[in-house]
Amino acid sequence: MGDVAVETPANNVTPLTKAAPLDTIPNIDSLEGTGNDGSDEYATLKRLQRHLEYIQLQEEYIKDEQRSLKRELVRAQEEIKRIQSVPLVIGQFMEAIDQNTGIVQSSTGSNYVVRILSTLDREKLKPSSSVALHRHSNALVDILPPEADSSIAMLGENEKPDVTYADVGGLDMQKQEIREAVELPLTQFDLYKQIGIDPPRGVLLYGPPGTGKTMLVKAVANSTTASFIRVNGSEFVQKYLGEGPRMVRDVFRMARENSPAIIFIDEIDAIATKRFDAQTGADREVQRILLELLNQMDGFEQSSNVKVIMATNRADTLDPALLRPGRLDRKIEFPSLRDRRERRLIFSTIASKMSLSPEVDLDSLIVRNEPLSGAVIAAIMQEAGLRAVRKNRYNIIPRSDLEDAYAAQVKTGQEADRLEFYR
């Protein structure tokens, strides 16, 4: 027999670890006539060639499938964008029936069983969350941020008031009490824990109009690094049933998510008056808002890193359940009548920012007996400044501008009787 192409015996063939490229595989014709050893090698080679051809066919098929799936993905993404680009209806998610359907409430108050877009994250789809519905089919196509359809907003770092405690004249005791109840628990909570007491959860500021309640809260917002949420009590009263309690939950949820936080509710008497046997749906809705507020303040989800400040001019009308300890632990009164020391501090604080004539004597205004609140004193100084601007003066003349401003802002005799309904 002639020379054999493969000299290694069949029982000593080295195992193949990697398929060789086609161009490196020997020609089949070169293996002819190699005997039994050559026939085994030839059979192995043919088997490997068939396997390689099969793999190449599979590769081409997979590439075709990949290109087809990419086209389908692009079409699906374009369809989703088209659906979400049309004007959508804001609704509220109620509950999920299964993975693909759920119950939603539209802005008109009606409930619908709708399909849920498959691309939405089901973990973010929680009851009472705001959602976007298709205008024709009411299908749930998007999940909105919690504050997207709410008037509740949190003040950013650049939006906080520029009022400091030094800008608030007088009110030394009120400043100390509100700092102990609001700022200290947020900054030095360990002190309360070491003593073994719970810090105050809420503070009520009450007093006549113009006594500095809101201004002191502005100073609190400026001096603390905590998140600050401001809302007016009347904003909770909405057109549709259930919207008010939902807004209360949204406010406290936002505060807990951004804790430490301070919630300031101004004019709390709009929703927290004493409860009675309501005869109308509107009165019952206001009472439901109050119940939700009471639950959020001392319920199971209450947080020590969330402080509530409320302000009102009518503390006598508030519900006793709101005033009890555990909800509003500290009640700070802002008196309408200021003594001479308080007046001097207010006049000096306001006058320090103004250009006054050297002859100005504020003591002549301080010693007068008319009742002056902080807002009235600020109005006197502002009116004096406006009169100086009107006359193109750089300084305020005491006997003319200040006296005229005092007479314009402080009513006496018959003029005071006409404005008695404001008191």
From Swiss-Prot:
PANTHER family, per database record: 26S PROTEASOME REGULATORY SUBUNIT
GO molecular function, one term: ATP hydrolysis activity
Protein name per UniProt: 26S proteasome regulatory subunit 6B homolog
Gene3D superfamilies registered for this protein in UniProt: 1.10.8.60, Nucleic acid-binding proteins, P-loop containing nucleotide triphosphate hydrolases
Family the UniProt entry places it in: Belongs to the AAA ATPase family.
Coiled-coil annotated spans: none
Binding site for ATP: 207-214
Keywords recorded for this protein, A-Z: ATP-binding, Cytoplasm, Nucleotide-binding, Nucleus, Proteasome
Gene Ontology, cellular component aspect: cytoplasm; nucleus; proteasome regulatory particle, base subcomplex
Role summary: The 26S proteasome is involved in the ATP-dependent degradation of ubiquitinated proteins. The regulatory (or ATPase) complex confers ATP dependency and substrate specificity to the 26S complex.
A Pfam family hit: Prot_ATP_ID_OB_C
Domain of life: Eukaryota
InterPro entries: 26S_Proteasome_ATPase, AAA+_ATPase, ATPase_AAA_core, ATPase_AAA_CS, NA-bd_OB-fold, P-loop_NTPase, Prot_ATP_ID_OB_2nd
Subcellular location: Cytoplasm; Nucleus
